[in-house]
Curated annotation (Swiss-Prot):
<dbReference type="GO" id="GO:0005730">
    <property type="term" value="C:nucleolus"/>
</dbReference>
<dbReference type="InterPro" id="IPR001650">
    <property type="entry name" value="Helicase_C-like"/>
</dbReference>
<keyword id="KW-0067">ATP-binding</keyword>
<dbReference type="InterPro" id="IPR027417">
    <property type="entry name" value="P-loop_NTPase"/>
</dbReference>
<dbReference type="InterPro" id="IPR006935">
    <property type="entry name" value="Helicase/UvrB_N"/>
</dbReference>
<keyword id="KW-0347">Helicase</keyword>
<keyword id="KW-0547">Nucleotide-binding</keyword>
<dbReference type="Pfam" id="PF00271">
    <property type="entry name" value="Helicase_C"/>
</dbReference>
<feature type="short sequence motif" description="DEAH box">
    <location>
        <begin position="234"/>
        <end position="237"/>
    </location>
</feature>
<dbReference type="GO" id="GO:0005634">
    <property type="term" value="C:nucleus"/>
</dbReference>
<dbReference type="GO" id="GO:0005524">
    <property type="term" value="F:ATP binding"/>
</dbReference>
<feature type="binding site">
    <location>
        <begin position="131"/>
        <end position="138"/>
    </location>
    <ligand>
        <name>ATP</name>
    </ligand>
</feature>
<keyword id="KW-0378">Hydrolase</keyword>
<dbReference type="InterPro" id="IPR044749">
    <property type="entry name" value="FANCM_DEXDc"/>
</dbReference>
<feature type="domain" description="Helicase C-terminal">
    <location>
        <begin position="450"/>
        <end position="619"/>
    </location>
</feature>
<dbReference type="Pfam" id="PF04851">
    <property type="entry name" value="ResIII"/>
</dbReference>
<dbReference type="GO" id="GO:0009378">
    <property type="term" value="F:four-way junction helicase activity"/>
</dbReference>
Amino acid sequence: MIVLRDSSDYSDSEVDLPSIEVNGERGNVPTSVLCNVEGSLLNSNPALRQPNLKCIKHNQDVENTTFQLDLRGCRVPSSQPQVITELENNIDIPKNIDAMQNWIFPQTQQYRNYQKEFCEQALFHNLLLALPTGLGKTFIAAVVMLNYFRWFPESKIIFLAPTKPLLLQQRVACSNVAGMSPGATAELNGEVSPDRRLFEYNTKRVFFMTPQTLQNDLKEHLLDAKSIICLIFDEAHRATGNHSYAQVMRAVLRSNSHFRVLGLTATPGSSTASVQKVVDCLHISKLIVRNEESIDIRSYVFHKKIQLIKVTISSEMNILKSDFANLYRPYFNFLRQKKLIPINCECLNIKAYTLFVSLRKYSFSSKNVQSKEKSKIMSCFTLLISCAHITYLLDCHGIIQFYQKLVETKNKAEGKGSGQSFWLFTSKPFAFYLEHLHNKIQGLSLNHPKMNHLLELLKEHFKDTSEGYQNQRVMIFTEFRNTAEYITTTLLAIRPMVRASLFIGQANSAYSTGMNQMQQKETIDQFRAGVINTLVATSIGEEGLDIGDTDMIICYDASSSPIRTIQRMGRTGRKKSGKVFVLLTEDCEDSKWERSQVSYRRVQKVIESGKKIALKKDVPRLIPSNIQPIFKFQALQNNADATLILNSYNNNSSSLSPVNTLANQAHSRSKRYLPFIVDDVFEDMESNLRVPTEDAKIKRFKSDYRSCIYNARRNVFSKPTYMGDKLTKFAKVPHSLLTLSIYRRGRLLQQCSPSSVTKYLKYEEKFKRKRMKKTSNALFQST
């Protein structure tokens, strides 16, 4: 009996196949499903029926040679790059049978029944758990890690977080719950050398990693995917498309189907389709979604008072908005005459989303049409979408943001040099309008009406005694960085009552510099300690980081994404009642807010009903079917400490014990900032003075060539020149002798396996771009 699994949907179907004879012994067809089978098992010569028991490592080199068996035993191409290993009953994973008799739930000061139930579900299913912020998602993950650590003594457990600042935070939290010592876990990211990561893989079993690091280590075979028994995804709603979460999951599934998955998130998605994508990507078999109104968690959630404050823009802003609309009105009327814009769309209150939908409809209807008019229409749509976004900044953020975006768009249009945007933003009327705006704002109050309400809310909140407002903390969320900087600067006028600080990401913008991780951590520590009582944050403060409980949340703008909205409001109401104020511009943001709330309620209703979400049915049971673990309430010794973990990480990254290689020493040195030509000369001399080994050649080819486009336009070398016996004295050859040796080596490997030849020829293109030089003397000496 063989169980066949189709790689597209993993559906199980059983079919009786005759016994076959291999080397004088009769037996059933092996249980490996996706194999590299030479011919049909039913029709081929019995002497050739020996199956390949080793599952194929599915990568680009062998993708076209991966097959699966159909119901008649004939090989057919695999529809998806997924490899399924042995059956559940024959899986050979070292287990601790005695430990599997029970599962441990740590004894804490406050026992919550819903955590116990969710832990039990996560132990035996691939679970996607959606809980509001602050209700113990990390605690549940730590319990799952603890029990799989006990049950499978040789397998590895990996906790994935999307950003590096989250790794230390989650490592400390999980270690505190599970009672793990700092030496039992490891924090791995791109800053840790590959040799160090390999050493950690060989000595430890619990890892806190970024998905990019795990993806690279699986690709480079530093970590065997079959050794993974449990994968935990923090902020699991990101696991869609080509995100690193999705790529990690696909890489593990190629060679391992027996591992447990736990996805943690506050909101699984903004629509039913997005939730289904997460379920498909993480191979989820169980979905648990709770909100603050759910019966089983309602008693643990504090009340949040949500108040909407609607504001109207000033008369000066209305005049600026009308004058700007007159500039792009001809392009709007052009599309209106073509009947490409809805009738109810107004030029003054144009919306980018409406234009984007109209653009998509036109693109599909004129897919095969090529004309100058189509190019003009597409360019007009692009221009109007930009103008709609600029108008939105004026309505919802203020004149400064409006002016900065106009200048930025003008500079981009000038650099482009063509299109409708170029003609509008380089025209004389626009130049006059921009100059008029620059002169006019000098005498106006630049504050958006939202700013006045913001100042009133903060003064009202911090009006108590000095002791009172020292213990009060407020977070202000905004979508754009320049708005956050403007708010922080404005709040300086009411110090020391309001001690505000900026909290943004690491990337640099056109007008500001980002905050590195050390600055971010220092800001959070000061906010927790009370040195800072108001934090002005962009999207970086919405998810992930443990900033702590806040007393009041102010949303300076509205987000159409329910995920971002729920995460913003989840920063308050954890330990006591909280307040949430949302500032909305009438006829602009109020509709966006309403759409996000309706979308969130609709998705929650669909998920809770269990309809329209297709869960996976083929998730294997990892523990033997005759074992039913019993719940055990046990107090664990807390061996973790944030300081010890941080010190151990720093010490481990500096001293590399048995793997302190020359490559690591070179990695720890400071970089040389020399011109690339100087580095090329050093490479040439080194390559001529030594004969590299095969491993050194491959390592050399993978090294970082900073001059990737140097000499790209010169003539490439001619291969027949290498094989000829006659070489002129001044013949041009590649600067490095490695090119010649590798090419000749490839000629000698024609009788070897294709993968061996590909390994060398794979990097041939990297040498075509290297400059050509006269090295005939060195060539004659080497030959």
